[in-house]
Design a protein with these regions (language model features):
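Extended C-terminal regions of large enzymes
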Residues: 6-173, 177, 385
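Conserved, non-catalytic sequence blocks in retroelement Pol enzymes and Pol-derived host proteins
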Residues: 143-144, 167-171, 201-205, 310-315
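Short Cys/His-based metal-binding microdomains
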Residues: 169-222, 299
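Short beta-strand-loop-alpha-helix junction that forms the active-site gateway
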Residues: 286, 298, 303-318, 344-346
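Domain-level recognition of nuclease-like catalytic cores that cleave nucleotide substrates
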Residues: 337-405
Length: 405
């Protein structure tokens, strides 16, 4: 029923609905897991009773194992710092919450083991080291995303879009080749990032520029914050004396930018290109965003890629190497250079490299989360448009793209 409601293909792995957000899932509660949580809550409440009859009631079959794990946790783990609360944090965690976390972890372990046995729907196991899971909040699903966009995302991430390859696999077609180029196998991956006809027609570039515009807004905001003195380019470390409580810090957030009156942002798009000023560097290279200040002798270069998520590490290395010579030339011209190769996946999964950029720009946590959501949606909407136009793809002049035989 949930698959039908969300528009998921029948062959889609249903664990995507119930996995935690850190495992690229929707964090819905499976009834069996919710039932276990309720039993833990009931046992915890009854165990605190002062009535001997209540406390002597028979326990669940799995109670001894859970209680054994709880005792081990309290004896060896409770003093260790396993979260971001800071050393010495004494926030008391209820036993029932710890037991529920055990149940949740057991369920996630089952999902991982199940995914390892899948042939296609297990990419989420590979990208967790370098990608940030999409935060599918109810606010986003209700007010921001359309049902069609959610359906596209879930099926694209689960590799269950009705592309030519899957239609043949499901016995609904005999033609496996791409609608547009007529050469490669028509998978969703090929259509969204690998079709040469779509590349030459500018479809991928327009999606890329949609994401790049959001990043440019983040850079502009960072420059404005530096001008107003909201951020500083000097790092500071706060210390708390033993036996004292930490107080709210008034230290300004760190940013790679300093206040200067001549910060200039140049952006390379499909419709409009730029040239690096010759007094800065004589080069034909054009990073997607070129931010510079002659007064500070500072350059920040940002190169964006919108790849298939599993290709992010490889593409990141390619883009860093691409601007190696330009970085050296700028350094020889006595400029301080920061190069950021950032990635936003074609299915809306952002790479950690983008988070690192936004953090180094000195943006607040609220701003960072907002820009991550916006870049994610921009990439996803761009891919959705490509998907919708897979049989009627048009070039920039409005004419049908000729299928290559």
């Amino acid at each position: 029923m949930l698959k039908l409601w969300l528009g998921l293909a029948l062959t889609a792995d249903s664990s995507a609905l119930f996995r935690g957000s850190n495992s690229f899932g929707m964090s819905l509660k499976r009834p069996s897991e919710l039932y276990k949580h309720l039993r833990v809550s009931k046992r915890y409440i009854l165990g605190k009773s002062h009535d001997d009859i209540v406390t002597s009631l028979p326990k669940d079959e799995d109670a001894p194992e859970l209680e054994s794990r709880l005792q081990f946790h309290k004896q060896f783990m409770i003093g260790a710092q396993s979260n971001r609360a800071g050393l010495g944090s004494n926030r008391k965690v209820q036993d029932a919450d710890i037991l529920k976390s055990f149940i949740r972890q057991d369920e996630n372990d089952k999902y991982k083991i199940h995914a390892m046995n899948l042939e296609m729907q297990n990419e989420w196991l590979d990208i967790g080291d370098f990608c940030i899971p999409l935060a599918l909040k109810w606010r986003t699903l209700i007010y921001d995303w359309s049902p069609a966009l959610l359906k596209f995302y879930l099926n694209a991430f689960q590799m269950t879009l009705p592309d030519q390859s899957n239609l043949v696999r499901w016995g609904k077609s005999t033609e496996k080749t791409c609608y547009i180029c007529g050469k490669a196998v028509g998978t969703a991956k090929h259509l969204l990032v690998g079709c040469k006809v779509l590349l030459d027609s500018g479809q991928y570039s327009r999606r890329h520029d949609r994401v790049l515009e959001v990043i440019r807004e983040a850079v502009s905001l960072s420059v404005a914050r530096a001008q107003k003195g909201i951020t500083t380019n000097e790092r500071s470390v706060g210390f708390v004396r033993e036996g004292t409580r930490a107080t709210k810090s008034n230290v300004k957030p760190y940013s790679i930018l300093k206040a200067a009156s001549d910060w200039t942002i140049m952006m390379d798009t499909y419709e409009k290109q730029y040239k690096i000023p010759e007094d800065i560097c004589a080069s034909a290279s054009r990073p997607d965003i070129f931010l510079f200040s002659r007064i500070l002798k500072r350059v920040v270069m940002i190169e964006l890629t919108v790849p298939w998520e599993t290709n992010i590490p490889k593409d990141h290395t390619i883009k860093v190497n691409k601007y190696y010579e330009l970085t050296n030339e700028l350094t020889r011209n006595r400029f301080v250079v920061d190069l950021y190769a950032v990635e936003v996946g074609a299915r809306g999964i952002t790479a950690k490299s983008l988070y690192n950029l936004l953090k180094d720009l000195g943006l607040s946590r609220t701003h960072i989360n907002a820009f991550l959501e916006r870049t994610s949606k921009a990439a996803l909407v761009g891919s959705f448009q490509i998907w919708l136009g897979r049989e009627r793809s048009l070039d920039s002049g409005g004419e049908r793209i000729t299928r290559i035989k």
